[in-house]
């Protein structure tokens, strides 16, 4: 493409060439042309193997990039680069650096990393200008002894080498700032290392160092020191001399203590001492006043120093996996602490002073021995509080209790206490192998294992509850947490004692000291005796006390168990179960442990109080006042013995939520093995009538949860007196009448800034106060400058009257705020043994809500919607502080997406929770730089849902309205499958299975395709849906039995057969413990197989592909198919040699990368990036025998309308894999030789010979249909897209002689019936077709950015004209034809040559067939449509109005009239241009006339029988007097180019297309041609047969040269 013009003449002064990632195997030849000017050459990431000798003639190079190639030798000629400053040859195969490198004296930056170097040349140290040297991973065994000669070295990287020692001359590098020696074999550091005065970073990790030299303390400017992964046993005391040190990394060493001198590191910010042997931390650590991160993980610490309280800037403290028994109370002094992790220690209590760390958000105390939590923790705004390894959610709901020992109020929940009594710890720690898992995994792996559970034959009750073959271990499942809670409740009772023989291993093994060899954390070890997994507590002693050698029960006993088996469940009651004294009610003679409640028939149940649903997020945000606790005790303990449910049914007026009992107590709605019951005794309900004392802000729900009323805003008026100082008042104000409101819509005067030390701050003025009066001057309704003047003229003493809003928290309240209140209290579902089908639940009160996800791409004008509400702003709805969509701009991104509606609640923005967010926070997220915004929205079910059409989906089975349950306001899940609907699904032709995927936090290992709004090809072509398109080989989905091609019917009960693609993705990604998929085993696509093709070195793959998403359909049999298909297989490539790939196959995957849903360009890039081995997954595509060859061959399309109006040409989606070409170039590369592209033939063939000519063409195998207006089904709905479509599709050409008739498959018309010009054109076509080499290659002389700016400018002008025309259209002012050539009732006789393409831009006014007058007025359009109806009814289908809305119809009319107006203005402008040109030249040549002028003014040849108006125009133009007067001298084009001219209207949408049309026009007359104000004069001699040579051209267009093979210069009749 670039050889059509001589580049060497255009620009030989090129300074920079970037050829990175171009798959080059040799240096391009054109680079050598720039040897005099080239300074920067980047050839990184190619396949270069050698550097030729001409390469080293680029003497002016200053920057050379050759990294990531296959260069095997660096020639000595590199010395020619005397001016080279930067050299990068990293990641090659260079074995040695030539000695001549020393002549590159200007070299400052050199990177030789990743080469198999073993040494450096001797002269390398002569590069004294070298400042940055990288020698990473080069197998270097020693440094040159004179490396100190590199005196200017600033950065030296020697990582991943084999260095065992360092030369002493290293100390001469006085400018060295960064030294990286990590990953070597250093055992001793030289003392001279401390003599580097400017060293800032020293990396010594992953070496064999056992000690550090004391001289390191002399590095006064050292900022970062990394000595991790060594063998250090102690640190030198001189380390305290590193006064500027900020990062000290000591991980994975053998340190037993830290030196006291560490306290001198005042600037230390990060200290990591994890995986050492520290027994204590020095108290001097408290002197590191800037310490922000302290990592002490995996040591032997038993206590933390008290001086930690001095670290006021500490934000992260991690002391996991130590032996801490107590936490110092001084830790409350860490005011900035936000993350405190104390996992797997031996803590029994937490200090109450921990509540002073106001910024603490994450507290991890899992794996300890805590009995309860201090009540003061309610002061903290915790986001996560971890009490167990398998805790499902970061926050829990707590209840208050009195500590039995201290009498203090504490917080507890179902995860507390964490450990059994101390008497049982040893048995838990020393459990025998028979009690543990036989095949315990080495780390925490989510595995389901089946155990043979031994039982005693004489334990009938245990046998009934011990049918527990399926055991769940090391998975975060709430069932074990509930049983732990049950065990804890039993241990609290004093009436029950344990037999010494009965052993209960601890749930968490505690004495696991992590060493460097083991690396196993305490939470990763399997629990040997976890009282969990749904196993009854009473049977634990017997079950775990038995050895594995005992016999299993026989089959008869198992049958009895199956009959009497009942799921162990957690029962609920309104009363707290009070344990009786010892010996009264629950202890047998043998002292065996029995359940403290009767078996399932009993009424009393285990109470679970303040234990939340595992899906809820709760945080403790407010400490209750003592009065509230008194109210709780009085209202909930009528008997004075313990908390009870007296307030269970008394919901105060301030109850934020009051769900049913079964909703409140719901624990896990996704468990298979539990069936929960709710038993509420009638007497409990009667007792619940007793109400608690009415205390402000306090009420109780069914489970005695302490509830509060929400915080409210109170307003108060203050009067403050301020004494002005020399610096002023120290305040700034904002707002005022006529100014931007400071808060909401309030135009008052507000305090916007208060200086901390100013007099206003000392007087009590705060930011946000509203200023009402200053020294008696009322400021209500005042403008901003008036308030400023009032403050300035107030004198020394200023008396202000302020209005202040303050947030008032309710008194006596414990606020347990759900982070997502809409997820509260889902109705409980019961499950059967087979497929889990939810039962119908009573409808909840309140509006039904549904959620959906919207993903918006930011446009130039933003997102196109507005929000309202949020904290700190006026509520959108009364009493609701959420954020809502308040307005959607018409035509914006949100309006085009169609997924947003006014009134939608915004729950999250890009994953950030917005339920409790401030308005300005939401605005900042929406206005961030991210190009896409993902919104989670909630909408009341009464409103319309986002559109999700199903074009091919069969309707679902009709079910009764009562069989579908819609999500209630508090329920998180959307629609649920009903039994009848599922039963109808099971009657299909393929089996249906239910697959359970445990969610352990990792990926699912599958990809899906399809949905109601997406194509699902090649799956379910007859019945679209959601299908699994890819399964990772060892992923979770593959292990669970899912296969490619499985149809997903439901996800966790949600029917997704009619869901959109995004809804299906959201359902799969919804957080849950277990993902239950209902899949139908549809067969895989026919012919699916995996092929492996090996490419020889340098061999091409040899295939071309077509198709792709958002492009031209690659399947000619299905225009909706967006798959990737093979369109050509070259016999010389690897694919042709293999023989298994053929034309028509569909490509599904390439080297494990899915091609489904990829665009054409993405698929081509993926195929080009494969190496020598190609593993491709294919299936059957389309049958090439049933498709016309023109449709199969790449780059050719038989009918431009066959693939839809929106797709302009198949060239856009056909690419060869073996070379980088533009889509146009790809098409030209693969088209057989021919004179023109297919649409060019259409424009040139005379209308009467369409059928016959096209049958003889090289590309067509059938009769070519002339283009016709598209059907309404294929028209785009967007008006602008319609204009682009019609501009891109070739229309009838204005130079055709006669109106086109409907095509007939008959033979060609006889020559006698043709006019002379038609026979002449036919002769030209026949003569030139075999001689043409192909379509001329074109080079765009206008850059893409310039073209885009020109189009935007034209569109802007067009928009202004459209608005003006809209106004004129309303007044009926468009009745006058502005062209001046003909009145309205007459058609213009001389249309310009460009009028035809311009008219094609309007769908409603296509160009008249046969070259009639152009349509530029409404009357002309009506006449043209009438003529079309008479002549060609099948071609006169207009754009139906019913397909367009009134707004779109008005826009269409305005656009059309604007184009007409532009065409008329263009005609006037060109006439004026011609007149100026003629007048400027007529003065000079009146007396002298050349032979060309006389010949041009001679009478024209005899006209043809029916000349067209265009031909008449040409004849009149050639014979007009004075127009062609030529002087004797050459025509000055610079004068002509300076004349004003504008681009034709037809180039507004597709300039290249219009240009190509002009290049293909046959000449209407053998005289002068005028195009766009360009004069093209030709010699009127008889040409030789063939094409006109360039030597016959005297004057050519100033826009482009006349090239050989151009149409329009035909033989002249005599």
UniProtKB/Swiss-Prot annotation:
Ubiquitinated; targeted for UBE3A-dependent multiubiquitination and degraded. GO terms for cellular component: adherens junction; cell junction; cytoplasm; lamellipodium; plasma membrane; postsynapse; presynapse. SUPFAM superfamilies: L domain-like (SSF52058), PDZ domain-like (SSF50156). Residues 719-806, 853-941, 994-1083, 1090-1178 form the PDZ domain. One of its GO terms (biological process) is epithelial structure maintenance. Residues 1-809 are annotated as: Sufficient for targeting to adherens junction and to inhibit cell proliferation. Scaffold protein involved in different aspects of polarized cell differentiation regulating epithelial and neuronal morphogenesis and T-cell polarization. Via its interaction with CRTAM, required for the late phase polarization of a subset of CD4+ T-cells, which in turn regulates TCR-mediated proliferation and IFNG and IL22 production. Plays a role in cell directional movement, cell orientation, cell sheet organization and Golgi complex polarization at the cell migration front. Promotes epithelial cell layer barrier function via maintaining cell-cell adhesion. This is Protein scribble homolog. It comes from Canis lupus familiaris (Dog). The lineage of its organism: Eukaryota, Metazoa, Chordata, Craniata, Vertebrata.
């Amino acid at each position: 493409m670039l050889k059509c013009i001589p580049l060497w003449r255009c620009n030989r002064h090129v300074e920079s060439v970037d050829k990175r990632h171009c798959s080059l195997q040799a240096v391009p030849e054109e680079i050598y042309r720039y040897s005099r000017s080239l300074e920067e050459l980047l050839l990184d990431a190619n396949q270069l193997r050698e550097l030729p000798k001409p390469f080293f003639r680029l003497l002016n190079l200053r920057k050379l990039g050759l990294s990531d190639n296959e260069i095997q030798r660096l020639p000595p000629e590199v010395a020619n680069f005397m001016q080279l400053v930067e050299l990068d040859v990293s990641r090659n195969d260079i074995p040695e650096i030539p000695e001549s490198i020393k002549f590159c004296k200007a070299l400052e930056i050199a990177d030789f990393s990743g080469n198999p170097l073993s040494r450096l040349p001797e002269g390398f140290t002569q590069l004294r200008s070298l400042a940055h040297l990288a020698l990473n991973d080069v197998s270097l065994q020693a440094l040159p002894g004179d490396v100190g000669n590199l005196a200017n070295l600033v950065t030296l990287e020697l990582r991943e080498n084999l260095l065992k020692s360092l030369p002493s001359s290293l100390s001469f590098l006085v400018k060295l700032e960064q030294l990286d020696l990590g990953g070597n074999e250093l055992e001793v550091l030289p003392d001279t290392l401390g003599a580097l005065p400017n060293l800032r970073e020293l990396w010594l990790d992953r070496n064999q160092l056992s000690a550090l030299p004391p001289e390191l303390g002399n590095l006064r400017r050292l900022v970062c020191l990394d000595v991790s992964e060594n063998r250090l046993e102690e640190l030198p005391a001189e380390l305290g001399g590193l006064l500027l040190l900020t990062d000290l990394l000591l991980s994975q060493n053998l340190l037993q203590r830290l030196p006291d001198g560490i306290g001198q590191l005042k600037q230390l910010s990060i200290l990591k001492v994890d995986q050492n042997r520290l027994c204590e931390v020095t108290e001097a650590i408290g002197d590191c006043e800037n310490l922000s991160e302290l990592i002490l993980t995996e040591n032997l610490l038993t206590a933390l120093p008290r001086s930690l309280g001095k670290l006021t800037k500490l934000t992260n403290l991690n002391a996991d996996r130590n032996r801490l028994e107590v936490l110092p109370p001084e830790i409350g002094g860490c005011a900035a602490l936000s993350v405190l992790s104390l996992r797997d220690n031996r803590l029994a209590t937490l200090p109450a002073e921990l509540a002073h760390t106001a910024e603490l958000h994450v507290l991890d105390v899992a794996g300890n021995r805590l009995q309860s939590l201090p009540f003061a923790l309610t002061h903290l705004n915790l986001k996560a509080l971890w009490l167990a390894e398998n805790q499902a959610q970061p926050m829990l709901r707590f209840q208050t209790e009195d500590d039995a020992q201290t009498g203090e109020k504490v917080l507890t929940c179902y995860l507390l206490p964490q450990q059994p009594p101390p008497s049982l710890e040893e048995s838990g720690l020393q459990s025998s192998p028979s009690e543990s898992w036989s095949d315990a995994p080495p780390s925490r792996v989510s595995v389901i294992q089946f155990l043979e559970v031994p039982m005693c034959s004489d334990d009938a009750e245990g046998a009934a509850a011990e049918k527990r073959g399926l055991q769940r271990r090391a998975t975060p499942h709430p069932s074990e947490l509930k049983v732990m809670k049950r065990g804890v409740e039993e241990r609290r009772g004093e009436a029950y004692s344990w037999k010494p023989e009965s052993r209960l291993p601890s749930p968490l093994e505690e004495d696991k000291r992590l060493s460097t060899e083991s690396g196993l954390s305490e939470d990763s070890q399997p629990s040997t005796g976890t009282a969990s997994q749904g196993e009854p507590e009473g049977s634990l002693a017997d079950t775990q006390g038995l050895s594995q050698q005992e016999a299993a029960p026989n089959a008869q006993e198992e049958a009895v168990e199956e009959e009497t088996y009942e799921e162990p469940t957690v029962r609920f009651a309104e009363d707290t179960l009070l344990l009786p004294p010892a010996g009264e009610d629950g202890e047998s003679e043998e002292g065996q442990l029995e359940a403290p409640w009767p078996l399932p028939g009993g009424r009393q149940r285990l109470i679970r109080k303040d234990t939340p649903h595992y899906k809820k997020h709760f945080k403790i945000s407010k400490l209750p006042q003592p009065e509230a606790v008194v109210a709780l005790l009085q209202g909930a303990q009528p008997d004075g013995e313990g908390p009870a449910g007296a307030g269970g049914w008394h919901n105060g007026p301030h109850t934020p939520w009051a769900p049913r009992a079964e909703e409140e107590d719901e624990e896990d709605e996704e468990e298979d093995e539990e069936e929960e019951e709710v038993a509420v005794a009638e007497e409990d309900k009667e007792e619940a009538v007793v109400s608690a004392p009415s205390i402000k802000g306090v009420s109780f729900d069914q489970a005695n949860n302490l509830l509060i009323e929400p915080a409210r805003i109170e307003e108060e008026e203050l009067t403050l007196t301020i004494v002005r100082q020399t610096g002023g008042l120290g305040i700034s104000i904002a707002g005022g009448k006529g100014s931007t409101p400071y808060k909401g819509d309030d135009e008052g005067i507000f305090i916007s800034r208060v200086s901390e030390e100013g007099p206003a701050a000392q007087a009590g003025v705060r930011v946000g106060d509203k200023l009402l009066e200053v020294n008696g001057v009322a400021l209500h309704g005042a403008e901003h400058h008036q308030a400023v003047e009032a403050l300035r003229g107030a004198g020394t003493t200023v008396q202000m009257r302020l209005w202040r809003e303050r947030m008032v928290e309710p008194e006596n309240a414990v606020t347990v705020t759900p982070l997502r209140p809409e997820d509260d209290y889902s109705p409980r579902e019961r499950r059967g043994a087979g497929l889990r089908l939810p039962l119908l639940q009573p409808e909840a009160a309140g509006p039904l809500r549904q959620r959906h996800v919207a993903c918006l791409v930011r446009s130039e004008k933003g997102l196109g919607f507005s929000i309202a509400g949020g904290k700190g702003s006026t509520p959108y709805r009364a009493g609701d502080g959420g954020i809502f969509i308040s307005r959607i701009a018409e035509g914006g991104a949100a309006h085009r997406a169609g997924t947003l509606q006014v009134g939608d609640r915004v729950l999250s923005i890009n994953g950030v929770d917005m339920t409790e967010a401030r308005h300005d926070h939401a605005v900042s997220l929406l206005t961030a730089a991210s190009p896409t915004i993902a919104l989670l929205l909630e909408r009341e079910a009464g409103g319309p849902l986002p559109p999700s059409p199903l074009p091919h989906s069969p309707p679902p089975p009709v079910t009764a309205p009562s069989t579908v349950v819609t999500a209630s306001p508090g329920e998180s899940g959307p629609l649920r499958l009903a039994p009848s609907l599922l039963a109808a699904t099971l009657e299909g032709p393929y089996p249906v299975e239910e697959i359970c995927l445990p969610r352990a936090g990792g990926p699912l290992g599958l990809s899906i395709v399809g949905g109601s709004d997406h194509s699902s090809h090649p799956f379910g072509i007859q019945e679209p849906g959601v299908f699994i398109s890819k399964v990772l080989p060892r992923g979770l989905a593959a292990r669970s039995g899912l296969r490619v091609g499985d149809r997903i019917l439901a996800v966790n009960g949600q029917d997704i057969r009619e869901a959109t693609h995004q809804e299906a993705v959201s359902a799969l990604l919804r957080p849950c413990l277990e993902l239950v998929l209902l899949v139908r085993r549809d067969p895989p696509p026919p012919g699916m197989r995996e092929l492996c093709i090996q490419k020889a070195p340098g061999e091409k793959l040899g295939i071309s592909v077509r198709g792709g998403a958002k492009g031209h359909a690659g399947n000619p049999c299905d225009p909706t198919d967006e798959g990737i298909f093979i369109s050509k297989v070259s016999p010389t490539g690897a694919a042709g040699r293999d023989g298994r790939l053929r034309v028509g196959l569909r490509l599904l995957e390439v080297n494990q990368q899915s091609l489904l849903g990829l665009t054409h360009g993405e698929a081509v890039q993926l195929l080009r990036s494969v190496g020598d081995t190609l593993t491709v997954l294919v299936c059957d595509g389309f049958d090439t025998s049933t498709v016309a060859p023109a449709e199969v061959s790449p780059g050719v399309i038989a009918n431009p309308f066959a693939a839809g109006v929106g797709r302009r040409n198949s060239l856009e989606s056909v690419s060869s894999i073996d070379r980088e070409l533009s889509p146009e170039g790809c098409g030209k590369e693969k088209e057989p030789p021919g004179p023109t592209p297919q649409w060019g033939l259409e424009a040139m063939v005379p209308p009467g010979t369409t059928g016959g000519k096209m049958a003889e063409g090289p590309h067509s195998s059938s009769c070519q249909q002339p283009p016709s207006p598209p059907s309404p089904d294929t028209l785009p709905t967007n008006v602008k897209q319609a204009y682009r479509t019609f501009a891109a599709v070739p229309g009838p050409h204005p130079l055709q002689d006669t109106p086109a008739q409907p095509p007939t498959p008959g033979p060609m018309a006889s020559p006698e019936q043709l006019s002379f010009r038609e026979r002449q054109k036919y002769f030209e076509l026949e003569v030139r077709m075999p001689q043409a080499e192909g379509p001329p290659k074109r080079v765009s002389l206008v850059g893409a950015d310039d073209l885009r700016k020109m189009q935007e400018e034209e569109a802007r002008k067009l928009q202004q004209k459209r608005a003006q025309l809209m106004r004129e259209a309303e007044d009926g002012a468009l009745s006058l034809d502005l062209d001046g050539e003909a009145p309205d009732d007459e058609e213009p006789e001389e249309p310009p040559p460009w009028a035809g393409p311009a008219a094609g831009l309007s769908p409603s006014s296509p160009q008249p067939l046969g070259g009639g007058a152009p349509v530029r007025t409404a009357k002309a359009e009506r006449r043209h449509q009438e003529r079309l109806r008479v002549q060609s009814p099948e071609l006169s289908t207009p754009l139906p109005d019913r397909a367009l809305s009134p707004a779109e119809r008005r826009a269409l009319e305005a656009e059309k009239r604007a184009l007409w107006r532009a065409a008329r203005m263009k005609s006037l402008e060109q006439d004026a241009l011609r007149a100026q040109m003629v007048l400027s030249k007529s003065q000079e040549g009146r007396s002298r006339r050349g032979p060309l002028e006389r010949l041009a003014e001679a009478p024209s040849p005899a006209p043809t029988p029916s000349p067209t108006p265009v031909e008449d125009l040409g004849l009149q133009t050639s014979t007009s007097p004075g127009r062609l007067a030529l002087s004797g001298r050459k025509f000055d084009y610079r004068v002509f180019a300076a004349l004003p001219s504008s681009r034709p209207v037809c180039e507004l949408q597709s300039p290249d297309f219009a240009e190509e049309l002009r290049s293909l026009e046959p000449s209407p007359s053998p005289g002068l041609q005028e195009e766009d104000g360009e004069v093209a004069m030709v010699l009127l001699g008889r040409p030789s047969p063939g094409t006109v040579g360039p030597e016959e051209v005297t004057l050519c267009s100033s826009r482009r040269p006349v090239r050989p093979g151009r149409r329009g210069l035909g033989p002249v009749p005599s």
